[in-house]
């Protein structure tokens, strides 16, 4: 795809540093070399050069790199200035470059967008670039790099190959009606559909798992009022994040705090006490707490060991019975110093750990720390083969839905025309993942989240 303008942007964060990089992509690159470097450049060679302004005054000295289209990241001519990392120098360089006709400042993610539009990368790989930059754990970096290498895209393309194969086969059969009632053909279609449905189902499971384990671990601290939830968050974060009082219902909103354990970013959420309330604001807080309980990875369900009425079996059973496949609970009984008990761990409901401790007296804290270490170690040990996003999961679900419904309806009425339409829609949603079937709105939404210079 040919663009008639040239884009320029800092590729490094603006600030004082050893090196500052300016990236330029487009048809005006050769003019910029001639005007501001005044040297002849071979592609993919590093040149130590002086950088001049429009009046031939020296601005800086540094390294210049030139990449000739189409063998560049964007598929266009690319030039990079590696100057001293002074924001004044970078600003002067960019202002002078902008004097060249049809050169403008790049939008966020525009370099990656041009790479996508020039078929240098697909949409999954483009997203992976941004994910590498914003990753919050080594696991996320590893998964994003895998996506950048095309691991996820290859899996999608393999399914697409099989879908397109059966689609073309069905279209051919439709054009030869005498074969519609051939039992061998029907059996073959059914077999192929079942195989593809299994492929998508397996990939959807893998995608969902990777989405969970490639992201921050979300741990919700929940329980009745005044059991020590806010004290626990303050203890873990080593600062006063939540207000702690003896008044029930102090926490009404959800308090978020990201804390690093074992090389993993854990998002802890202090939530409103779960109880029946007439207070409108508190009710909203309780609804938010329940919402986060449903979407988190792990629940720290806290109780005051001295208040046995709070430990209601139905209350616990309701949370336990609604746990999702990848969720877990640790029960925490606080304030054991008030009943002269030593800290210990037991098992509740046959499989859930129950930790008895005192935050106030700093008793049993090692059990809690070991539990968090166990959670993060488990997270680190899961092999995340690629980085998954919500839109990938949504598209896979829709693709699978059309295929399952199409197969079921076809087996009832044997209308291949309707099955063909469902397969076409299934293909459409898979193509949306890699960006082969896209809308400008989708692209703008994705690339607007990128930083400037990527």
Swiss-Prot record:
Self-association state and partner proteins as the record states: Homodimer. Heterotetramer of two MnmE and two MnmG subunits.
Residues where GTP binds: 226-231, 245-251, 270-273
Binding annotation for K(+): 226, 245, 247, 250
NCBIfam families: mnmE_trmE_thdF, PRK05291.1-3, small_GTP
Species of origin: Buchnera aphidicola subsp. Cinara cedri (strain Cc)
PANTHER family referenced in this protein's UniProt entry, alphabetically: TRNA MODIFICATION GTPASE GTPBP3, TRNA MODIFICATION GTPASE GTPBP3, MITOCHONDRIAL
Record-stated family: Belongs to the TRAFAC class TrmE-Era-EngA-EngB-Septin-like GTPase superfamily. TrmE GTPase family.
Function: Exhibits a very high intrinsic GTPase hydrolysis rate. Involved in the addition of a carboxymethylaminomethyl (cmnm) group at the wobble position (U34) of certain tRNAs, forming tRNA-cmnm(5)s(2)U34.
CDD domains: trmE (cd04164), TrmE_N (cd14858)
Superkingdom of origin organism: Bacteria
Location within or outside the cell: Cytoplasm
Protein name: tRNA modification GTPase MnmE
InterPro entries associated with the record: G_TrmE, GTP-bd, GTP-bd_TrmE_N, GTPase_MnmE, MnmE_dom2, MnmE_helical, P-loop_NTPase, Small_GTP-bd
